[in-house]
Amino acid sequence: DFLDQAIPLIVGSHQNAQSYQILDNALVIKLDNGDSTGLAESASFIGFNGEAAKPSELVFKHNDLHFIVQFDASNPIAQSDMAGISDIAMESALTTIMDCEDSVAAVDAEDKIIAYQNWLGLNQGTLSETFEKSGKQQTRLMHQDKNYQKLDGTAGKLKGRSLMFVRNVGHLMTNNAILDQHNNEVPEGIMDAVITSLISTYDVNQHNTLRNSDTGSVYIVKPKMHGPEEVAFANELFDRVEELLSLPRNTLKMGIMDEERRTSVNLKACIYAAKERVVFINTGFLDRTGDEIHTSMSAGVMARKADIKLTKWISAYEDNNVDIGLACGFSGKAQIGK
């Protein structure tokens, strides 16, 4: 059903396909009734691997996302499929957030060092993890880029990984990983900005084999900001970090979490405060409701979590985030996370 919806045939259905091959730079599908057909939109087929008469992979583009139809005769799934299809690999998450935040990833200096080490491994392309499953040792590595042959005979390549963002902490937190001359913990958001950006120079300066950004950018999500003044502070912090690391202005891109009341009601002003950097906005149910609880705590008993999700104000909050993002020109240029 998916193939019939994403890449429909001129006639017939992919369910009745017996074979796929490339003839004269076009995909030809032979059906079980002996007829041959092609794609209703031929431009959706962009390349392949293997032999033209018997490809091992077919690469398609649909709604600006890619997917690969794979053929492997040794696979049990392929052996039960008339055309020998073994799997379909989908390009799904466009972006992935690596988290340095206190609530989920790092609560002290030791945790923070681990988070930085993982971010370093991701930017160097060397991160791996070995674990035991079903009595066997298994190792997970970062996915390599996917190479394929374009229809004109030239080489094509698809990213094997989604675009990585790194979430720093908000402005309030401090951390004992670094102490100042008076033995005070340093502001954790400043520490995160400097160290995660420094680590990201492996990618910016192309000192790695698995590239994250194709444009030499670093993508940082800033959470828990209360209004445009705090966004402006983050923007100035990014200016200072770029100067410290000798990075071109606006190398550090900003994702703004719309999860505090003053940000929600001033979202346009928040976006304006980082207008040269902003690449992402998103909502956050727990932080946003938490701010509402702290703001209105004396007004009476709050609704329970499950009931809050059904309230009109939560729907209005989510809708407003999308509406403001679109009104500010995000379509086709920046991400509205949902």
Where does each model-flagged region fall?
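Catalytic alpha/beta active-site cores
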Residues: D1-F233, R240-L247, K253
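Short, internal active-site loops enriched in acidic
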Residues: P223-G227, D258-T263
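Active-site capping/gating regions of soluble enzymes
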Residues: F238-R249, R261-K338
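Aromatic-lined carbohydrate-recognition surfaces of secreted/lumenal glycan-active proteins
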Residues: L252-D258
